[in-house]
């Protein structure tokens, strides 16, 4: 769920559930609250030339393989303000036994989740793209 702090506080009082955990995040990512920043990001992306990727890319907005630079720009914009389709993304990746997933970023949260879902797939985590050679 995403919403204002006040709305989420009200909801947590009104519903009965086992656990209601508010995430400490810097923005309402992957929700309609990101529509305006997403539009600005889209304008920024129009100025950048994307090369054809060396390998297909999967976004959480549309969990399918994509190699089209223009479509990748659209997916980057759309995943800012749409829900994460994590299970579908993991299911797609599970179909490829030769897959090597690399999480690029400061934490290993996603690679940890992936290891639980994808038992036979190689998964690595690096802090920056500088650590990758292909």
Q: Model segments located where?
A:
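Acyl-group transfer acyltransferase/transacylase scaffold of fatty acid/polyketide systems
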Residues: 1-134
């Amino acid at each position: 769920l995403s919403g204002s702090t006040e709305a989420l506080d009200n909801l947590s009082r009104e519903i009965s559930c086992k656990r209601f955990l508010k995430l400490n995040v810097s923005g309402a990512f992957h929700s309609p609250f990101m529509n305006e920043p997403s539009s600005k990001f889209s304008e920024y992306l129009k100025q950048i030339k994307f090369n054809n990727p060396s390998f297909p890319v999967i976004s959480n907005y549309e969990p399918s393989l994509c190699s089209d630079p223009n479509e990748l720009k659209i997916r980057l914009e759309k995943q800012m303000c749409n829900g994460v389709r994590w299970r579908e993304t993991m299911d797609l990746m599970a179909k490829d036994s030769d897959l090597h997933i690399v999480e690029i970023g400061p934490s290993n949260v996603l690679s940890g989740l992936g290891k639980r879902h994808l038992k036979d797939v190689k998964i690595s985590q690096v802090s920056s793209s500088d650590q990758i050679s292909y």
